[in-house]
Regions:
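A short Gly-Trp-Pro
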Residues: 2-133
Length: 133
């Protein structure tokens, strides 16, 4: 079973749970989208093991389990996000934030909710919403 070597806890509720459709996430995770649970920087703690990190872009680094290879986390300057599939109870973490990177959304992946949609994270509208959440 994947991700047995890394365990983490958070001292707070997540800032949001969102879905990313960008090409980077598609390629890194091998899926049309990635669902992540985002926490303000400093609230996520690794209590067993720790991910191995690499710089994936100018604005983020990503971490994975060096034992099983599972993607675990990505980190921006102000937040850390873990992937819902790494959680013990993923069914309890329904997206409530937004859809990101919709310019790269694969056409057959149909969005069935009314969450806000943003083209990219450098979109001024996204930055404004992000700063208020």
């Amino acid at each position: 079973m994947p991700l047995q070597k890394i365990k983490f806890l958070s001292a707070s509720r997540p800032k949001w749970i969102s879905i990313c459709h960008c090409r980077m996430c598609q390629k890194v995770y091998g899926n049309p989208s990635a669902i992540f649970v985002a926490f303000e920087k400093g609230y996520l703690e690794f209590v067993s093991g720790s991910p191995k990190f690499y710089k994936s872009s100018d604005i983020a680094k990503r971490g994975f389990c060096s034992y099983c290879g599972s993607p675990v986390i990505f980190s921006y300057e102000t937040l850390d996000a873990v992937f819902v599939g790494t959680l013990d109870d993923p069914e309890n973490w329904q997206p409530n934030g937004c859809h990101l990177g919709v310019e790269s959304q694969i056409p057959w992946e149909i969005i069935h909710d009314s969450l806000p949609k943003y083209r990219t994270e450098d979109d001024p509208e996204f930055k404004e919403v992000n700063s208020k959440q």
